[in-house]
């Protein structure tokens, strides 16, 4: 069976009660491809998770944007994987480049978080990606492989993992990796999984692209053989997110 297209919407630290209501209403009213064709997950800030989960159409799932690396306790400001499970939140985004850079989360720490979240029953969108300096130095694959290895070292079962390749230089900048650039990294990542994890994991694991994906760029990116979907930032707050979801039909055509 082929890899089902996956579209995640990362709302980041955005939204008010009324804005969230507008986004949810837009998604509920939108004509989107069937769940047989595309899996859709949106990730609002923690405070809006229960509201969005309750009001959003059932075929769109909800993700947290982060969770703590171990069981809850004296960790002020953190949210544990167990809390998310208790709320019925099925997904979590881990290792986003903004947390790696702004909060100094190391690859090893991200690997530990992924392993713990999976062990509690969450599904994980695990993010990897290089900076502009790293790309210009020709070390893209070295960086992405190191980040992926830190996850592979901690987990054995990849069933509930989606890998998101996010070139950091393309996040929020309006710059998009060309379809060829995205395909090259995705194919190399899949080869890395084949060699270092297993051919089965390489074949079944979805590798999605994140980095200024828009309604204008999504179809050409979706047509690439190793691009299995998107992790969308700013555009996931806008009506064009519907168009990005529907880029999944390029794969099923």
Curated annotation (Swiss-Prot):
Reaction equations catalysed: D-glyceraldehyde 3-phosphate = dihydroxyacetone phosphate
Q: Which UniProt keywords apply?
A: Cytoplasm, Gluconeogenesis, Glycolysis, Isomerase
Q: Where in the cell is it found?
A: Cytoplasm
Query: Where in the sequence is the active site?
Result: 96 (electrophile), 166 (proton acceptor)
For this record, the Gene Ontology CC terms, alphabetical, are: cytosol
Member of which family? Belongs to the triosephosphate isomerase family.
Report the protein name in the record.
Triosephosphate isomerase, cytosolic
The protein's organism comes out as Secale cereale (Rye)
Lineage from the top down?
A: Eukaryota, Viridiplantae, Streptophyta, Embryophyta, Tracheophyta
């Amino acid at each position: 069976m082929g890899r089902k297209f996956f579209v995640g919407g990362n709302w980041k630290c955005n939204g008010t009660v009324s804005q969230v209501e507008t986004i949810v209403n837009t998604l509920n009213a939108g004509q989107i491809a069937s769940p047989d064709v595309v899996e859709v997950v949106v990730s609002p800030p923690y405070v809006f998770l229960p509201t969005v989960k309750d009001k959003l159409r059932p075929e769109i799932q909800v993700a947290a944007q982060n969770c703590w690396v171990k069981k809850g306790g004296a960790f002020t400001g953190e949210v544990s994987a167990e809390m998310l499970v208790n709320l019925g939140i099925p997904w979590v985004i881990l290792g986003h480049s903004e947390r790696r850079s702004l909060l100094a989360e190391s690859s090893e720490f991200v690997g530990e978080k992924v392993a713990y979240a999976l062990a509690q029953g969450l599904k994980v969108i695990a993010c990897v990606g290089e900076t502009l300096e790293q790309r210009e130095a020709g070390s893209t694959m070295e960086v992405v492989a190191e980040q992926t290895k830190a996850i592979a070292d901690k987990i054995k079962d990849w069933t509930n993992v989606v890998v998101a390749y996010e070139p950091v230089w393309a996040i929020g900048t309006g710059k998009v990796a060309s379809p060829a650039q995205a395909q090259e990294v995705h194919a190399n990542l899949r080869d890395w999984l084949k060699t270092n994890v297993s051919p089965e994991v390489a074949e079944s694991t979805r590798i999605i692209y994140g980095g200024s994906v828009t309604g204008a760029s999504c179809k050409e990116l979706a047509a690439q053989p190793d691009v299995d979907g998107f992790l969308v930032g700013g555009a996931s707050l806008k009506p064009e997110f519907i168009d990005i979801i529907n880029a999944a039909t390029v794969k099923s055509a």
